């Protein structure tokens, strides 16, 4: 019963709290200074870019194909990361269905370092595995700021579900109208 109350409470909080504040809460929970510092630099910009270079279109197309599966936080967060990289997406597209993501069928040969990190982080968020270490995430030579931003977005999606993206897009649309 308490778990149901927590979920309901988190649902209301997620719909009200700006995305960057959800990232700050995540950073506080991790409490490793290099991670906190990197998240703080990210949230200091306050204009996070959720989608660019066809990412939104690839993500939304999968949402239409697998509308039921994309509502699950684990699937949504993994699809968000897999669709961020055009080459990785071309490898993953055919192995995602209404039931699951078949990571063992995704052949990542030829993917660059960014795609490699996105693939393994997507698998970790989806399966609950731990292939990507925190020390790797905090190293800007291994994980670029753009990839780190997408990974942090996926972590918040994993925790709060697709409604985080929907609410943030509404917030962005409202700010554009107000300009």
Regions found by a protein language model. Name each.
Residues 1-111, 127-179:
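Extended, charge-biased low-complexity segments
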